[in-house]
Amino acid sequence: MNLSSGKNEKNTTLTAENQTIIFRLTALWALNDCGLGGFLHALNVPFSGLIIGGIAVALISFIAHFSNVNKGVILNSLIIVLIIKLLMSPHSSVTAYFAVSFQALCALVFYRILNINLISILFVCILSFLESASQKLITLTVVGGMSFWNAIDVFVENISKQLFADGITHASLWLVGTYFFIYFVFSVLLAFFIYSLLEQFKKMNISKRDNPSLWQFENVTVAKPKKHLPKWIKILLYSGIVVFVICTFFIYNKEQFYNSFLIYYFARTVSVILFWYYIVMPYAMAFVKKFLNNKIPAYQSEVDEIIELFPKLRLIVYYAWNQTASYKGLRRLKHFFTITLFEIISFK
C-alpha cells in the first residue's frame, strides 16, 4: 500500500497515515475514472461528464497535498489509475487516457512551480477543462469538417429569419463560445471549492476524528450502473452529422449543393471515420497497452488492493449521496463530494 515505492521518485518522509490516505484517494480516483460515471448516470446526476472531470482534478489535488507535491507519488498514482482503467474499461478510447494524464501532469507542473494555492488550483482546473472541451470540439471538427460548422450557421440563420427580423449570423461561433464559457465557469467554481476544502483539511486532525466503520454503509442501496455507449452509437451519431450537413445545404443553400459536394463530403467523412477507428485508434491503443502492460508487474499488488477496495468505496459513495438528499443542484454535489472524501479517508 506504499505508493511512494515506484521508480520515479522515492520519499521516505511520508507518514503511514498519509500513505494510507494517498492510497485511498488513488483508489477513489480509479473508481471515478472507471465506474463512477456509470453510477452517476444511474443516479440521474446532471452534467455527469463535467462532474467526473471535476472529481478527478480534486482528487489529484488532494494527492498532491498529502504527498507534499511529490513527483514520484503523483506519477505512481497516475500509472495505477491508468492500469486499472485498462483492466476494467478495456474499450476506453486513447483520448480518455490522454485526458487523465493531462490532468495529472498539469497538476504536477503547476503545484511544483507555484505550490498548492488558489492561483495554481485555478490554473490546473481551467487548463484541464479547456483541454477536455477542446478535445471534443477537435474530434467533432475532424469528423464533420468545417462544412459541419457552416451548416450550423446556415441552419440557424434561416430558422432565425423566420422568427426574427434579423437572422442570427455566425451561430457556430456563439455555440462554441458558450460551450467554452460553461466549461470555464465550472472550472473556476471547482477551483474555489477545492481550495476551500483543502483549507478545511489543513485545520482538521484526521487521526483524532471519530472514524466510521463500514457497517454503517452496509444497508445502502446500490443502483445498477449504466453501460457505456457501444461504438455503433458513435458511428450512428457521426452518420447523423453527415445527414444534417447534406440536408441543410440541400434545403437552405441549393446553389452550393451539387453532386460533387455530396460525393466529396460523404467520401471524406467515411474515410475519416475509418481512418480514425481502424488505423489511428488501434495503433495508439496498442502503444498505450504495451506501455501499461510493462508497468503491471511493478504495480500488481497496489492494483489488486485497490480493485478489492472498490465495493467498499461504492457503498460509501452511495451513503454520501443518500445523506445529501435534502440538498439540490450544485449544493448537493458539493456536500456529496465533501462527505465522500471525509468518509473514505477516515473509515476503519
Which residue stretches match the model-derived regions?
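Membrane-embedded alpha-helical hairpins and interfacial helices in multi-pass inner-membrane proteins
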Residues: 121-200, 223-239, 243-266
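Short helix-perturbing small/polar motifs within transmembrane alpha-helices
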Residues: 2-4, 11-19, 24-29, 98-140, ...
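Charged, low-complexity cytosol-facing tails and large interhelical loops of integral membrane proteins
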Residues: 3, 56, 307-348
